[in-house]
Amino acid sequence: MPTANPTPAGLASPPFCEEDYLRFSRLVAERFGLFFPEKRRNELEFGVRQAFLASTCPDFNSYFAVLNDSENGPLELERLVNHLTIGETHFFRDSGQFDALANYVLPGIIIRRRTTRTIRIWSAGCASGEEPYSIAMLLRDLVPDIDSWTIMIYGTDVNTRYLEWAKRGVYGQRSFREARAFTYRDRFFKQVNNQYHLHPSIRRMVTFGQLNLAEDRYPSYETNTMFMDLILCRNVTIYFPESVTRRVIQRFYQSLCPGGWLVVGHSEHSLGTYQRFHTHNFPNAILYQRPLEDTPAAQERPAPPEAARLPARSGAGLSPKAAADNSKMEVRVEQRKPDPISRRYRRGRTTGLLVLPSLAVKSVPASQPANAIEEAQSLLASGHADQARDLLKRWIDQHPDDGKA
């Protein structure tokens, strides 16, 4: 197993010539989707040189050959990408996006999933874990009975070194830069000297795994990337060429359940990359949502917030005729007695914190099967096959004449 470069101490490593730049840049683009144009040449050289010095290879020619070797290549490629990727992040990074998540997106998901009590969230390119842990802390506040829910927060990164740091849940001062982060630090961290140890209750909410976004291994059950309610991939695709970014965003679209949300960084590629999504403009944030239906008509109109769908579920226990009558009624959400989540969701709509699309708030026809099917898929994805079957059976019993079921 390669451990250290035998180059004698004090001697310089080989020069990084034009040929080296071209072949190594092609290699990392093909394997990891990472784009190193001429202006980033020094970054590529530094990363390659650091990984090379950790190998047993005498020169760049032999090192390049090892990277392409079927036996030793995977280990050396892992070491190389660990030196090439940047893990700069901190808790609740980008306050505008987290305001939108805390006041609108997450409360809407919670309302929508109240029946199944399952939520699936993916932090793609999570680096050292601050982002998925931030989401976990928000959910601790937003879901009063969280222990009765099945919440899956999945953090992935191509850099295994960062993932090990994330699993430890130990952070320094630089991870706390936002005002919201200091509030949660006092509640969910224990200070030990100059480090902050995350509370086990938050660490248990997040699982981590290695995933190369440039590969086509997702969405799949194998990678646990199906039926997501929310995907965050911020400041990751800025290192990809546009062609790779388009493929990644298309896979994210397929990984999301209908109505699921995508959060990307402000500097990501935007040349039509997100045209299949609904675009939602919030103060200091733009978020994307997969339409509830993949039809041209659905793509032309804004997707309603999930609170508007609550009245349809109020007819779940009614007879088919009563449920059908209920589906024709126009319902104002404000007339319903709000629980804490609904109040928080509505507060975001009325205090000027958020800018929502113009909506006609009506209940969804009770004969529409998409909601039940979507929830059943979510249950299946989280291992609750019996609950999924029971949910669909109840829907069929209530809608015996609907052939779509």
Please identify what each model-predicted range represents.
Residues 2-122:
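Conserved AdoMet
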Residues 124, 145-232, 236-244:
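Extended basic-aromatic, gly/pro-enriched interface segments that bind polyanionic ligands
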Residues 128-146:
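Conserved SAM-binding loop of SAM-dependent methyltransferases across substrates and taxa
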Residues 246-258:
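A short glycine-rich, Lys/Arg-flanked "PGG" loop and its adjoining helix->strand segment in the class I
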Residues 258-266:
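Conserved beta-strand signature within the Rossmann-like core of class I S-adenosyl-L-methionine
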Residues 278-328, 333:
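Core SAM-dependent methyltransferase catalytic element
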Residues 361-401:
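Alpha-helical segment of the N-proximal tetratricopeptide repeat
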